[in-house]
Amino acid sequence: MTRVWPLLAGMMLLAALWLGPLPEMARRAFSPHMILHLGVTLAAAPLLAIGAIRLLPGHWRDGGQALAAALAVSALDFVIVWGWHAPALHEAAAASPIMFAIQQASFLGAGLALWGTAFFGRSRRHAAAGALAMLLTSM
């Protein structure tokens, strides 16, 4: 249970965010939209990433191109976040439940990729690449 608690907590948080009043409120007002967006990307996604990574065998966490992954994930996050905040896509997500679901799924996917990059490796190189991904995304 100690290995999977972040995964379970992330799932419960997603359920609270997506099944509560926020999705409907987010269609009409900016503040609930941002609470939902940040709750998915900055609270649920890191918990899910930590929980999922804990389930991987240790040898899977040793390889990879940390810097290339960090740059690619940062670019992906940038495109997804800013793309959905462009007026046409933002309005489409507010008007259509399907588009809203796609928006939320893409926010979660980008968040998982970003936090997975930050937490994935065991080396200092991976930690530095993860920190770089976070820094680039926050700009």
Question: What does each of the following model-derived ranges do?
Answer:
Residues 1-139:
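Alpha-helical membrane segments of multi-pass proteins
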